[in-house]
């Protein structure tokens, strides 16, 4: 029995509707992904600083003991920011007796990898670091965007490592940044990224151009890096090199790393990047010998939700001793913040909060009063 023309027309229209809906869903999904990444990219607390993860081969008592020590050392480096902290005598003793700091541990199967995962008492470790006059790096840390171009050593073609690529290095970057307690996002690799920056653009390492075309991600820092074979005039031989820059739009750091493998170079870079951030944002005991008080006037705080968000940020800072609401006049909330670092150091830390913006003008009494505007809901 042959179907009627009317039925076929209706079926055709339904099929077209499904195609339209599917296309709309795809667009919405990409938009949502971009929005989610942009929102996530702003400075936020790193919640896993007291957790360590170590890949193991079995679940024996010997392996658990060895992995527990390594996980503890991983957490120590996360909370301090500098691997050399492990050379401290008391830290070495604590690592040997890591069970005193252990809260819980478990084995997790992740694909073909068996992982020992441990949680430690963060406050006890922070107390250990401070007792030894070692730096402490708080939970609120800068976000970064990582543009990485890799050159094929055979055909010399350049390719970008993005979230949408099938690069073998994505998992390595994720694990390396976890190990150091930092956030380093990879570009989505969508149409907008493709129109803004190509692999050759990143390969050139033009920092100002790459930074300006990365605004959509809203990160505190933008990193550009390239990996490829270069000729070393001194040794008259070829070597594998990673060159990079780190910028926040105002300052820039550059360096070159030589290694045997791309994976090894990426791991070295992540360690250097984490060390750089720690040198800027971790707090030394010598800075915390005095108590400082400053008044913060924050405008556009006109709802209870905004007030709570501001208060959460201020109280979560490692340097904060006490926060009090001093006054509320129209949409301006005035807080008195007592901290253990000078005002200029506090301002450096607060620059990570993209919802808090300083006005262009500067107060004469900026040593005791700071003005901010709340941006966001």
Predicted regions and their residues:
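Amphipathic beta-strand/beta-sheet edge segments enriched in Tyr/Trp
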Residues: 47-53, 57, 214-267, 368-376
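N-terminal segment of the mature soluble domain
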Residues: 68-90, 146-204, 310-335, 340, ...
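A short, hydrophobic beta-strand-centered structural micro-motif
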Residues: 99-108, 186-188, 201-234, 350-366
